[in-house]
């Protein structure tokens, strides 16, 4: 039984990490052709998002500038103007294709996220015994660490999350989440989240140290404050 208890967390962790990713990737590949066919036949506007709309507007502004350039060079030969209009037409067609492709990817990414969330929720509900074993394994692992290693780990984690260079990492992660879910890239919202998350995490950490660590391991708190200073 102890051997089974020791080996259980590793396949369970591996399945949590790789199984949702593998299933969602397979679902993505198998559903891609159907979504492309459905989108091309229906051309629904339901999934229009601000990110793609902004890109389309930027590209159409460029095309408008080309049309203004066309008006300025009317003294050129008709052949030259005809070639210019053909080029603008091809660029417009390419823009529409890119717009549709981005919408298709948005639908697939959204479906993949739902699948991953569903699988992880099923793990948390059905794998209660494995979660208990994993929790006991983590507690035993942390208990065997020295107070110096624990303090160093806490200090390293806090510096990564709320350190001097942490806003760059938060900005990157929030931007990836926005892009993955199709939200509009708003600099004000991202700046607000980047400035808020580290403060919240710092407050929670200080409360945890004051309420929990002071009671469980006062020596760890002393070492942590000494290393932090």
Swiss-Prot record:
InterPro entries: CemA. HAMAP family: CemA_PxcA. Contributes to K(+)/H(+) antiport activity by supporting proton efflux to control proton extrusion and homeostasis in chloroplasts in a light-dependent manner to modulate photosynthesis. Prevents excessive induction of non-photochemical quenching (NPQ) under continuous-light conditions. Indirectly promotes efficient inorganic carbon uptake into chloroplasts. It is a multi-pass membrane protein. This is Potassium/proton antiporter CemA. Pfam families: CemA. The chain crosses the membrane at residues 7-27, 106-126, 193-213. GO terms for biological process: potassium ion transport. It is found in: Plastid, Chloroplast inner membrane. Disulfide bonds: none annotated. The keyword Chloroplast applies. Belongs to the CemA family. GO terms for molecular function: antiporter activity; proton transmembrane transporter activity. GO terms for cellular component: chloroplast inner membrane. The keyword Transmembrane applies. It catalyses: K(+)(in) + H(+)(out) = K(+)(out) + H(+)(in). Its main location: plastid.
């Amino acid at each position: 039984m102890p051997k089974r208890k020791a080996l259980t967390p590793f396949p369970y962790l591996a399945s949590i990490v790789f199984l949702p990713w593998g299933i969602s990737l397979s679902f993505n590949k198998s559903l891609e052709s159907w979504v492309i066919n459905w989108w091309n036949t229906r051309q629904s506007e339901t999934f229009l998002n601000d990110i793609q709309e902004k890109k389309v507007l930027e590209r159409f502004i460029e095309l408008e500038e080309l049309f203004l350039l066309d008006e300025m060079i009317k003294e050129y030969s008709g052949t030259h103007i005809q070639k210019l209009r053909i080029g603008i037409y091809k660029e417009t067609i390419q823009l529409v294709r890119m717009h549709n492709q981005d919408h298709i990817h948005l639908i697939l990414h959204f479906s993949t996220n739902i699948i991953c969330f569903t699988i992880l929720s099923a793990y948390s509900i059905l794998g209660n015994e494995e979660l208990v074993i994993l929790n006991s394994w983590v507690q035993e692992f942390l208990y065997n660490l020295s107070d110096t290693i624990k303090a160093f780990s806490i200090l390293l984690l806090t510096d990564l999350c709320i350190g001097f260079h942490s806003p760059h990492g938060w900005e990157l992660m929030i931007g990836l989440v926005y892009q993955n879910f199709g939200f509009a890239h708003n600099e004000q919202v991202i700046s607000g989240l980047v400035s808020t998350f580290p403060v919240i995490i710092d407050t929670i950490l200080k409360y945890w140290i004051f309420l929990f660590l002071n009671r469980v391991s006062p020596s760890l708190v002393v070492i942590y404050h000494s290393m932090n200073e």
